[in-house]
Amino acid sequence: MCMGSQGDCQPFIALALALQAKGARVRLYAPAEMEELCATFVAPLARPLIDFFGMPHLSVKKLLESDPVVRDAMSRGNFFKFMQGVSQPNYLDMTLSDADLVLSDLLNHFPADHIVYNTLFAAQGATAAEVLNVSSTLVSMQMTGSPSAFEPCLLISPKLFRKLPFFLRRATWHAFSLLMIYAPIFRDTKWRVKKLGLRPLSTSQKMDIWLGNAAGCSLIIARSPLLSPAPRDWPAAERKRVLGAFILSAQEQVKAWPPSVELRAFLDAADPPVYIGWGSMVAISPLHMLTLALRVLKSLGKRGVILAGWAKLSANLLDESIASDVEELRSYLAENVLIIESNAPHEWLFPQCAAIVHHGGAGTTASALRSGIPSVITPCFVDQPELAEKVNRLGVGIGLNQFHSVTVKQLASALSTVLTDQAMRSRAAILGEKLCAEDGAAIAASDILLRLNTINATSFDEQSVKRPGAARVGVQPAVGAA
């Protein structure tokens, strides 16, 4: 079960395919708007379709488009205001309506032997596992394990985090966890008690669910240990749970998202371009994002490929500009820049670029690092500043301050550095080779199935495997929402 943007859900497609390749039957529960993405990725490939169940009510994209509070919070990188925006009653109602549909499907049509869910659907995934009396796995794209004094908390900037004494560093993680368990995704008392007849979750139970410590649950961190090694103050067992990013290969992405004739021609026409893409982020305004990108490219005389993203960047936005250089930007765009409206196969595109400018989302960062091409990160909020700092520390790119404060001069300077610093480019290439040797989705799939088979070899099979309609565990296990 996965909730969120494409960046939150796409890794679960990779995991679903990896589980399917190992003989598991899989049903993916995700926002209905991801159905086309799922079908697009899988249909052209020589393998069975993923069994997809679309959750129709909650859409992060629609929430961003329709709610000015949420949109402004993202624009300014204000996490607290963002949480305030998504704490509205209608957000909770939509979440629980989708959760109810998922649970009904699990009970009546797909009696899974194991439930896998992401952090944005943690309470609902854990409840589904509780009702079905099966084991579960929490997959996190962030380092949301035990409180650590060595892993920057997502609540504050990494720079501020490292200035704090150790006990306060851990305290920020406790505060972050408390903030999350009082978010709408955990306010499900009405659903659990009135609809399902379960006891309400206590604070300690919510905390266990959030940290992946709930009964019968295991935690997987979908990050490369080369990028995010487990903090040394995590428990020994937890340090082994950083398994690698869940990535669809370049071949899979190209078959799913065939590069357009225009993109191929643009890449072949001259020197490698600079890629600029901010994914699902909308910062300040789409016009600001576009003019920032164009002014930086123009100042350096570089060609660029710009991803339209959720901000819907396009040349038409320049019609809204009253800036004195708007005609120069329009001309530069027409001659030197290609804006791609649809999703781009990052694993194929990034290695053909001279540099990569992006927002620091977990999936984009993983693909950028795997490409061996240095990047500039302009983070907005949540885990993006932390990933920007990690890229800085590895010396394979430059992480800037939050997007809303980045100037043309700052971004141009950073981009110039990653384009010309040969030592940095060499480090990026070496790291990229190492990361490409990893297969986090396959490792995670093996881990999940091994654990499921181990459970079935013990007393667990007497409790849950014998329920009516259960799949044969260990032969062809049914994994729900992987």
Feature roles, as predicted:
Residues A18, L37, T127-A128, V296, ...:
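Hydrophobic/aromatic ligand-binding patch that stacks against planar heteroaromatic rings
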Residues R27, V305, V376:
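Conserved beta-strand positions in the Rossmann-like core of class I SAM-dependent methyltransferases
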Residues V305, G309, A315-H359, G363-T364:
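Donor nucleotide-activated moiety binding/catalytic core segment of transferases
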Residues M1-D51:
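N-terminal subdomain of nucleotide-sugar transferases
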